[in-house]
């Protein structure tokens, strides 16, 4: 909206009519460049706010591994081979 207002003001001023084609293109390029930067900043700000709201609303009451405990046994135990009684 602001770039459109600036463009209209430039066109209404008498000096704007005195500008040649290249200068007018440079002005329009600068306006579009600023417009792109503003939109990018607003988009990034919106994404950050949504991410913060999502993280804040996510509550982790219990973890996935809450009820599990570590094993007291080793992973590889030696086998005790007993001879059968004779």
Curated annotation (Swiss-Prot):
The keyword tRNA processing does not apply. It is a single-pass type I membrane protein. The keyword Phosphoprotein applies. Keywords: Cell membrane, Disulfide bond, IgE-binding protein, Immunity, Innate immunity, Membrane, Phosphoprotein, Receptor, Signal, Transmembrane, Transmembrane helix. Residues 45-86 are cytoplasmic. The chain crosses the membrane at residues 24-44. It is found in: Cell membrane. InterPro entries: CD3_zeta/IgE_Fc_rcpt_gamma (IPR021663), FCER1G (IPR042340), Phos_immunorcpt_sig_ITAM (IPR003110). Residues 19-23 are extracellular. The modification Phosphothreonine is found at residue 78. GO terms for biological process: antigen processing and presentation of exogenous peptide antigen via MHC class I; antigen processing and presentation of exogenous peptide antigen via MHC class II; cellular response to low-density lipoprotein particle stimulus; defense response to bacterium; Fc receptor mediated stimulatory signaling pathway; Fc-gamma receptor signaling pathway; immunoglobulin mediated immune response; innate immune response. The modification Phosphoserine is found at residue 69. GO terms for molecular function: IgE binding; IgE receptor activity; IgG binding. Residues 1-18 form the signal peptide. The modification Phosphotyrosine is found at residues 65, 76. GO terms for cellular component: external side of plasma membrane; Fc-epsilon receptor I complex. Belongs to the CD3Z/FCER1G family. Adapter protein containing an immunoreceptor tyrosine-based activation motif (ITAM) that transduces activation signals from various immunoreceptors. As a component of the high-affinity immunoglobulin E (IgE) receptor, mediates allergic inflammatory signaling in mast cells. As a constitutive component of interleukin-3 receptor complex, selectively mediates interleukin 4/IL4 production by basophils priming T-cells toward effector T-helper 2 subset. Associates with pattern recognition receptors CLEC4D and CLEC4E to form a functional signaling complex in myeloid cells. IgE Fc receptor is a tetramer of an alpha chain, a beta chain, and two disulfide linked gamma chains. Associates with FCGR1A; forms a functional signaling complex. The signaling subunit of immunoglobulin gamma (IgG) Fc receptor complex. As a homodimer or a heterodimer of CD247 and FCER1G, associates with the ligand binding subunit FCGR3A to form a functional receptor complex. Associates with CLEC6A. Interacts with CLEC4E. Interacts (via ITAM domain) with SYK (via SH2 domains); activates SYK, enabling integrin-mediated activation of neutrophils and macrophages. This is High affinity immunoglobulin epsilon receptor subunit gamma. It comes from Cavia porcellus (Guinea pig).
């Amino acid at each position: 909206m602001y770039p459109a207002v600036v463009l209209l003001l430039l066109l209404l001023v008498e000096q704007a009519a005195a500008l040649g084609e290249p200068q007018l293109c440079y002005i329009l390029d600068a306006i579009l460049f600023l417009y792109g930067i503003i939109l990018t900043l607003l988009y990034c700000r919106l994404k950050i706010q949504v991410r913060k709201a999502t993280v804040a609303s996510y509550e982790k009451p219990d973890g996935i591994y809450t009820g599990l405990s570590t094993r007291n046994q080793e992973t590889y135990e030696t086998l005790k081979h007993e001879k059968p009684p004779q």
